[in-house]
Amino acid sequence: MGVPYVPVIGLVGTDLLKRRDDMVLAPDPFGEGKVTVVAKAMRPDVAVFHVQKADRQGNVSFGYAVEAVILAEASEHVVVTAEEIVDRITEKDAVGAFLPSILVDDVVHAPFGAHPGGLTDRYAPDAEAMKEYVAASRDDASFAAYLDTYVFGVSGHDEYVERYVRKARQPEPVA
């Protein structure tokens, strides 16, 4: 969005400002003497999203909240992985939020790209795989072992899907 800061609701009077150097109190330009908290705007280098559908030009249909579009607008680069690549998506065709191709740097076809999480209207989370992920996240050594197996231990996305999104563990479609 290109703004240097954004107002943040609900933080006036909290001690969070004592611990954060990226938030300050500022005069509310519309509040007649009131103050508001403003936070330095984020400018991520890259935002990566996994979506239900995208087209070859980079137009994207998000099946979830518009906040993802705001993050894409704030980012220097946007990479989208998609369950399905179609010939053309227009804003009228989009289910949920729409991200225009002008904001997208690359689109990658990646079925089950949200695994072990779920994807709205496509598949539910893989409960067993999520339990394993949560357990591995408890300490650095366990998480390093998890990454060695599931990220660095496969040659790419196709091998990951073949090995770990097995028919027996494949999540059921969400109605």
Functional labels for PLM-detected ranges:
Residues 1-175:
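Conserved alpha/beta enzyme-core scaffold
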